[in-house]
């Protein structure tokens, strides 16, 4: 079994990635502005603290730091993404080819990059009769995405890797990994057989 992880961590900044809206919790749709809602003519301004924190994480993971990076728009059509695109560094990461040591084994880090968090959908009601509410307070909060090589060999090892990385990031940059909103992980699992998309 081979497991690679795509981990998204909310960065502990006071404002969002491209605007001055606060990242603290508030009543739904209170911490929003034309920039994080994607209004035409609004002008984003990069959060320096988020960039510095992302670079610090990439350096900590011993990544090769790129001399020039940029952001691009990744198009999605979801109700929790008011702009219908996510601003990301997917094509131009802060760092590549790093590693994290876990129990004497080196786990490869393919990439570290910044991107915006989408909004949050909350469903209320019984199954089949649900009503969906969208809260855009989270939209635009800075995320760092860390993508590992498929070097993990079991679900238990993957969980231990995440736990250890969270401990290190708490110490390094004050990461607050307290709930499912601040840390989200996707696992890519290969059983060594023919590839099947699920």
Feature annotation, model-predicted:
Residues 1-198:
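Basic, nucleic-acid-interacting segments
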